[in-house]
Amino acid sequence: MTVDLDQYAKPGKDYYLALGLEGSANKLGVGVIKHNLGQLSLDNRAEILSNVRDTYVTPPGEGFLPRDTARHHRNWAVRIIKKALIEAKVKGSDLDCICFTQGPGMGAPLQSVVIAARTLSQLWDLPLVGVNHCVGHIEMGREITGADNPVVLYVSGGNTQVIAYSRQRYRIFGETLDIAIGNCLDRFARTLRIPNEPAPGYNIEQMAKKGKHLVPLPYTVKGMDLSMSGILAHVDSLAKDLFAENKNKKLIDDETGEQITSEDLCFSLQETLFSMLVEITERAMAHVQSNQVLIVGGVGSNERLQQMMELMVNDRKNGSIFATDERFCIDNGIMIAHAGLLGYRMGQTNELWNTVCTQRFRTDEVFVKWRDD
């Protein structure tokens, strides 16, 4: 069944324009997207007019606090919005709607973005569209890669989920029971006191490429779910012993007798976590009888994760893997603009009173009205 995406089209206009605002964590993103009339397809793709982002970066060994992150977003919002509009070569009066991240995420940064969205809505007399952050990642990934109906591995600083579409919902088949994978990697980066720029997870990835020895770490998969807090606690204790030069037989490689390094710990942590993700993703693929995997979220840009997932997919008949680069994996405004515009085209808008952001907003709470396949 084909969904009519143009039942709310404005007379005499053959395209839609939306501005998206993202700020659920330490990245403030603004994007402008264009949809032509008709179904989106390989012959009628969404057009990215601008995708601007600024990141709040803290010193090595420190995380980002909600109040400081919110202050960054407030300080940069006007400049980033202006830059996005200039790059897109559009004015506020050209837009059809203002889309914003309604959740999930950090409360104070989300509020800063919502206030900016409300201000623009009233300034330009445009409707507001609240967007689920997770659905934004999924829809942007589908649009960029052309993936049809994949199993989605959503891995970021605040979320770890295995998702598949069914009956106008993105259903969660497996997820973390405690911390997200991005949070796990970021916290270990703080333990090692490595730089947060360009991103702690990226710096962990680069160190892991130099690792040679695989240190045994807890492997915690429980059915379709996984747990990472125990793994983090274990590898943290090893790192602290390494820095303190404490004698610990686990810091000596059994085969070579060589000293375990920080690079080895990064390598071991990545290999263990990614193996767990591959396992539950493959199980979801078997359950829904899909041969496609789409990786989204900030951790999705990790080359080793993509490589391990590709090895698994290649063992399946006609398997294929889809992923995007850091422009779209890492939090951005264009994904919010795209998902929001899909909702707007189906008549889904938010009244001002219904724009309250929420830190907890499940992926499967969203009614995916623009799909009926």
From Swiss-Prot:
A divalent metal cation binds at H133, H137, Y154, D331. It is found in: Cytoplasm; Nucleus. Keywords: Activator, Acyltransferase, Cytoplasm, Metal-binding, Nucleus, Transcription, Transcription regulation, Transferase, tRNA processing. Binds 1 divalent metal cation per subunit. It holds the Pfam family TsaD. The keyword Glycosyltransferase does not apply. Its EC number is 2.3.1.234. It catalyses: L-threonylcarbamoyladenylate + adenosine(37) in tRNA = N(6)-L-threonylcarbamoyladenosine(37) in tRNA + AMP + H(+). GO terms for biological process: positive regulation of transcription by RNA polymerase II; telomere maintenance via recombination; tRNA threonylcarbamoyladenosine modification. The keyword Isomerase does not apply. Substrate binds at Y154, V155, S156, G157, G158, D186, G201, E205, N302. Its cofactor is a divalent metal cation. InterPro entries: ATPase_NBD, Gcp-like_dom, KAE1/TsaD, Kae1_archaea_euk, Peptidase_M22_CS. One of its GO terms (molecular function) is N(6)-L-threonylcarbamoyladenine synthase activity. NCBIfam families: arch_KAE1, gcp_kae1. Component of the EKC/KEOPS complex composed of at least BUD32, CGI121, GON7, KAE1 and PCC1; the whole complex dimerizes. Component of the EKC/KEOPS complex that is required for the formation of a threonylcarbamoyl group on adenosine at position 37 (t(6)A37) in tRNAs that read codons beginning with adenine. The complex is probably involved in the transfer of the threonylcarbamoyl moiety of threonylcarbamoyl-AMP (TC-AMP) to the N6 group of A37. KAE1 likely plays a direct catalytic role in this reaction, but requires other protein(s) of the complex to fulfill this activity. The EKC/KEOPS complex also promotes both telomere uncapping and telomere elongation. Belongs to the KAE1 / TsaD family. This is tRNA N6-adenosine threonylcarbamoyltransferase. The lineage of its organism: Eukaryota, Fungi, Dikarya, Ascomycota, Saccharomycotina. The gene is KAE1.
